[in-house]
């Protein structure tokens, strides 16, 4: 590479530099700066005031010097409570509620991701194999819930699953049950609404990957004697791995920090870290 080409690569036009700078500015403003603020608070001491933590630095006007007060007590409490949580002979009453709820959040998010994958994969596969008109209609049906408020959709489930909701009233009128079922404020309702809310985020990445699958590969596998199941595990599934990873990340990451659904339909026994931090 000659000097001129190297110079052109290092000193691009201002427009190109501006375009490249946009994602870095986005990360700086929305991730690095908030992370730095939280990191600063973690080294402060708690107090009943506004803001509810002590400043890390203060100026002594009499002596004219800068005082730095860094506390490691928050980190000591984390490790101590973490040990109490894991130790079967430890003080379970002092176990850190944040660690327990974070573990509960991971389990709930993992369950949601697995169920979304099991439902979303065949759905995305069926959409990708439909004709163009049917495909557009099915994609519209997947996107249709996003046209309404997320909060309204959660409230709709409250009307369906509640003690006096539509499902219980229907079953009582049909004399299928004698008393209303406990469909609300439990793990069942939490997982059900979580799957409903995040299922489109699994289907769409899978669809974009499966729709690009070359049918000639499946035809060649069939000509060589491979059955549908073997063709799926040797061709379709490996080629859709990127969509599986993308969909799983889009579901798992926001599901861990979800607080609206646990607050409205999860009840007091199904705590998640987003709900605890919000409260």
Give the predicted meaning of each segment.
Residues 3-9, 56, 154-195, 229, ...:
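Membrane-interfacial helix termini and adjacent extracytoplasmic/periplasmic loops
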Residues 11-16, 49, 59-62, 72-82, ...:
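Interhelical loop and adjacent transmembrane-helix boundary motif
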Residues 18-20, 123-160, 218-219, 232-233, ...:
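Cytoplasmic-entry segments and transmembrane alpha-helices of multi-pass inner-membrane transporters
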Residues 22-23, 144, 196, 201-215, ...:
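Transmembrane alpha-helices
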Residues 152-154, 159, 202-205, 243-278:
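Non-cytoplasmic
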